[in-house]
């Protein structure tokens, strides 16, 4: 029995059969069931995923914990996760998302525990890099994917950008814009988010070749616009950096503080949120380094689904999304 023969029996195309047997694409549930029934009846031996699906027909409940409240960057991460879940709904996959605000370990732990209590089969989480979160994730009997930022736990994979590389790209841009001399203030969300700290490490590494450019401050804003405004307003009252590099969210609030200061400060950002694009259009942010948030959400759900049904892990346990520089007139 071949894919072509299954397609003929099901009255559909070979491409549709391939998508069903390989868990790709959004196929009508009735048609997907008909294809799987034919494959099972004819003892077709497809790839490992299809064998598992035919054998078990199990429902898959995936949980996700994301600090998206008040942080528009994560809107695209959530859209990606929901999009993939819809595509996999034909295979009995459901997705439950717990949205939290900020970087409080107790809040994150509570959200994860609630999902586990609801009986999720797998968990995707943007984890805080603190001992209590690591210990909890390590203790779970279900597969875990870390999304957007990573920590040292036994997980199926990390899905997100290479933050160190992102920081180095920012450092390259700083060198180009400051012409070899200047003072820089970096703004991160939290020292408990490894990705934010990796960006700062990458920035410092890139600037090692230009010793007259210094990173004089690393400010925390909890990825919150109000906190960002207050922190930068206080800092700028006593300091005048040549450049501010945002390495996380809270950019809208931080920009308000910079503009209110009246000081001539150049700005680099990360991500492509509405606020960042608006300030770029106005010429107030020179460039931003993006990281494909939609793909992060999409891949996190896909990786967990594949692992549950086939046991496959991504190579080296990493699924990296692309870091790209975007300027005002980028397409």
Please describe what each predicted stretch is.
Residues 1-54:
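N-terminal helix-turn-helix DNA-binding module of bacterial transcription factors
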Residues 48-107:
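Amphipathic helical "hinge" segments at domain boundaries
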Residues 73-88, 166-170, 194-213, 227, ...:
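Short, solvent-exposed amphipathic alpha-helices that sit
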Residues 86-107, 185-186, 204-226:
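Short beta-strand elements in bilobed, periplasmic/extracellular small-molecule ligand-binding domains
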Residues 110, 122-138, 203, 220-277:
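Hydrophobic alpha-helical
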Residues 128-165, 273-281:
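Flexible loop/hinge segments that line or gate small-molecule binding clefts
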Residues 158-184, 228-229, 274-276, 292-309:
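Hydrophobic alpha-helical segments within soluble ligand-binding/sensing domains
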Residues 207, 292-331:
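Hinge/cleft segment of the Venus flytrap/periplasmic-binding protein
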């Amino acid at each position: 029995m071949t894919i072509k023969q299954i397609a003929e029996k099901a009255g559909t195309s070979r491409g549709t059969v391939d998508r069903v047997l390989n868990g790709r694409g959004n196929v009508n549930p009735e048609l997907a069931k008909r294809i799987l029934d034919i494959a099972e009846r004819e003892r077709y031996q497809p790839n490992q995923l299809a064998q598992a699906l035919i054998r078990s027909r199990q429902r898959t409940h995936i949980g996700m914990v994301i600090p998206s409240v008040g942080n528009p960057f994560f809107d695209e991460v959530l859209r990606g996760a929901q999009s993939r879940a819809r595509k996999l709904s034909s295979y009995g996959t459901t997705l439950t998302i717990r949205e939290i605000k900020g970087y409080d370990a107790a809040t994150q732990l509570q959200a994860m525990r609630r999902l586990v209590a609801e009986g999720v089969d797998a968990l995707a989480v943007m984890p805080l890099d603190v001992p209590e979160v690591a210990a909890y994730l390590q203790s779970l009997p279900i597969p875990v994917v870390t999304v957007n930022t990573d920590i040292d736990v036994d997980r199926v994979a990390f899905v997100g950008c290479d933050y160190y590389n992102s920081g180095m790209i920012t450092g390259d841009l700083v060198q180009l814009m400051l012409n070899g001399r200047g003072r820089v203030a970096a703004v991160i969300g939290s020292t408990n988010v490894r990705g934010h700290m990796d960006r700062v490490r990458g920035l410092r590494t890139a600037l090692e070749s230009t010793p007259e450019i210094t990173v004089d401050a690393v400010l925390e804003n909890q990825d919150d616009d109000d906190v960002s405004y207050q922190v930068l307003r206080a800092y700028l009252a006593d300091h005048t950096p040549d450049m501010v590099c945002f390495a996380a969210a809270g950019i809208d609030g931080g920009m308000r503080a910079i503009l209110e200061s009246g000081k001539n400060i150049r700005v680099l950002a990360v991500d492509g949120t509405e606020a960042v694009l608006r300030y770029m259009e106005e010429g107030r942010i020179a460039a931003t380094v993006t990281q494909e948030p939609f793909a992060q959400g999409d891949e996190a759900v896909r990786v967990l689904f594949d692992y549950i049904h086939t046991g496959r892990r991504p190579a080296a346990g990493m699924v990296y999304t692309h870091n790209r520089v975007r300027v005002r007139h980028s397409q």
